[in-house]
């Protein structure tokens, strides 16, 4: 039987109520979180480390799939951290989205945030002119 939240024929308010009732507090918290990932030249994502890891007492990064097992609300800059071509970046983003939908308990897709104000910031993409103070 298909879960109500996955049934596109049901009213939105029913789907939302069903999904929220199924979610643990940890999964709800994960949906409010964003990960800024590093995409290497080979099209593989890894987590970006920063001082927050040090302040949190995290000595080593957990495997990305372990960190994302509860889901995540947003993936930040999935294509733009290193210079990659658009096809490599999109393939990597698709792999990551597939993981979110197939390997998490509820299969909630992530939102992707990429800088595109003057064009997609990746190798061989067109960037349009803009003023210095945009």
Predicted regions and their residues:
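N-terminal beta-rich core of secreted/periplasmic extracellular enzymes
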Residues: 1-134
């Amino acid at each position: 039987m298909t879960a109500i939240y996955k049934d596109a024929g049901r009213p939105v308010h029913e789907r939302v109520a069903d999904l929220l009732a199924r979610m643990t507090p940890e999964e709800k918290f994960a949906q409010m979180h964003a990960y800024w990932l590093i995409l290497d030249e080979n099209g593989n994502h890894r987590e970006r480390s920063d001082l927050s890891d040090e302040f949190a007492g995290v000595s080593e990064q957990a495997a990305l799939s372990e960190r994302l097992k509860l889901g995540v609300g947003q993936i930040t800059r999935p294509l733009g951290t290193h210079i990659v071509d658009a096809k490599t970046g999109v393939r990597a983003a698709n792999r990551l989205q597939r993981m979110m939908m197939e390997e998490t308990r509820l299969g909630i897709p992530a939102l992707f945030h990429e800088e595109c104000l003057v064009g997609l910031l990746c190798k061989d993409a067109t960037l349009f002119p803009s003023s210095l103070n945009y």
